[in-house]
A protein has these predicted regions:
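Short, aromatic- and cysteine-enriched interfacial helices/patches
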Residues: 1-5, 24-25, 203
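Generic intrinsically disordered, low-complexity segments enriched for polar/acidic and small residues
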Residues: 8-11, 22, 43, 135
Length: 225
């Protein structure tokens, strides 16, 4: 009986010791538990590098005499922007992009230099009206996707594209990879030029004209800063 009482007294003493410890350090325990679950993922910022990137617009020949015309391969020469993302999980992420509308130029060798100058002049003055609308911009509203086993991230970027004074919501699929301090995004998407009130150039009295669908392709490099 005495041994049983001794065990009970020892157990009660142990419980009292735990109670004293908890009473002495309640704030420390609560703060540590909260901080481990509420810290947001670190954000990494990348600046787009136009010099190391490729950004193209393809305008297709259309009209009754479409076979008399040529597709146009237009390069975007001057653009800037920023990507923000969580380095381990990619998401949450955001993209902001600004293009100088007077930097779009014809690149196809099928055209002579004189023809390219005429096309570029029409792009600036008739199609994009660069003096009135000097910038084309895109700002993401949401980024979703999944990380593949090889480290490539398949992303779907939804956002607002503003061109020729008109803003429309578009989706951009992209394959994103990261190596060291560099980020690379590749993909393509289409827009309807009529949605942005962009005029089409034509020839042969309108029997050859640029189609409504414009195809954008990109291979963009960005650097962490």
């Amino acid at each position: 009986m005495r041994k049983l009482l001794n065990h009970r007294n020892s157990f009660i003493s142990f419980l009292m010791l735990i109670a004293v410890v908890l009473d002495l350090f309640p704030v420390t325990l609560v703060v540590n538990a909260k901080s481990s679950s509420s810290n947001p993922p670190a954000e990494t910022r990348y600046r787009l590098d136009a010099g190391r990137s490729t950004f193209m617009v393809r305008a297709f020949s259309g009209g009754l005499l479409w076979f008399k015309g040529h597709d146009h391969f237009i390069a975007v020469r001057d653009f800037s922007g920023e990507v923000r993302l969580a380095p381990e999980t990619i998401i949450p992420a955001s993209l902001q992009l600004t293009i100088k509308s007077n930097s779009l130029v014809e690149t196809r060798d099928i055209f002579t230099e004189q023809q390219k100058q005429i096309i570029n002049k029409e792009l600036r003055e008739i199609v994009l009206e660069s003096e009135k609308y000097p910038e084309i911009s895109f700002k993401s509203t949401s980024v979703t996707g999944k990380l593949n086993p090889g480290g490539q991230f398949d992303a779907r970027i939804e956002g607002d594209l503003t061109m020729h004074g008109v803003t429309r919501r578009i989706d951009i699929p992209a394959q994103v990879t990261m190596a060291g301090n560099d980020l690379r995004a590749r993909g393509e998407f289409t827009v309807d030029r009529s949605d942005f009130r962009v005029k089409a150039t034509s020839a042969f009295h309108g029997l050859v004209r640029v189609r409504d669908k414009l195809k954008f392709t990109f291979d963009i490099v960005a650097h962490r800063y």
